């Protein structure tokens, strides 16, 4: 068997040419759910540093994040809010995957570190502006005392 072959399929098809599979688990562990997935507990993702290698900081993410536009859209008859995979792929290609049918998907969880760094950048700018405002206030008081 191939590790990229289906190990378990719920639906009326077992290959990429039949798009009616509702749930598919591959031998390599990849899992596909073809519609909404409701979880009553937590969804947790392994993130232990011991599992990772070549760890580097993302650095500045705000300029790239500003190139992404949140969208409201209809998909499968339901109103949704999200992003377009094509836009994400332009700035964060590692967050976009493609299935056998060349349909793109976004790793929304992967946007969290991007948002954390952008938030830090904005907070640093806010702090810098607050310090600048205090200096301006002091200078205005000095100028007022000269008059």
Residue ranges and their predicted role:
Residues 11, 56, 74:
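Residue-level detector of conserved, well-ordered beta-strand and adjacent loop positions
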Residues 68-76:
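Active-site nucleophile-His-acid catalytic modules used for acyl/amide transfer and hydrolysis
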Residues 8, 23-39, 43-45, 49, ...:
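Low-complexity, small-hydrophobic/phenylalanine-enriched stretches
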Residues 32, 47-57, 94, 98-147:
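C-terminal intramolecular chaperone/auto-processing assembly modules
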Residues 53-67:
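Periplasmic N-terminal gating module of Gram-negative TonB-dependent outer-membrane receptors
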Residues 81-82:
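Residues that recognize and position ribonucleotide moieties
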Residues 88:
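Active-site-adjacent helical/loop segments in soluble small-molecule enzymes
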Residues 1-21, 47, 93-94:
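Right-handed beta-helix
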């Amino acid at each position: 068997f191939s590790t990229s072959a289906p190990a378990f399929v719920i639906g009326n098809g077992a290959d990429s040419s039949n798009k009616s599979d509702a749930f598919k688990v591959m031998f390599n562990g990849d899992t596909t759910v073809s519609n909404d997935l409701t979880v009553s507990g937590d969804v947790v993702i392994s993130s232990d540093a011991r599992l990772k290698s070549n760890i580097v900081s993302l650095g500045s993410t705000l300029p790239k994040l500003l190139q992404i536009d949140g969208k409201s859209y209809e998909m499968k008859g339901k109103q949704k809010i999200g992003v377009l995979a094509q836009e994400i792929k332009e700035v964060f290609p590692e967050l976009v995957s493609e299935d056998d049918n060349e349909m793109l998907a976004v790793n929304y969880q992967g946007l969290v570190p991007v948002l954390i760094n952008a938030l830090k950048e904005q907070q640093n700018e806010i702090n810098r502006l607050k310090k600048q405002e205090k200096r301006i206030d002091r200078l205005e008081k000095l100028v007022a005392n000269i008059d």
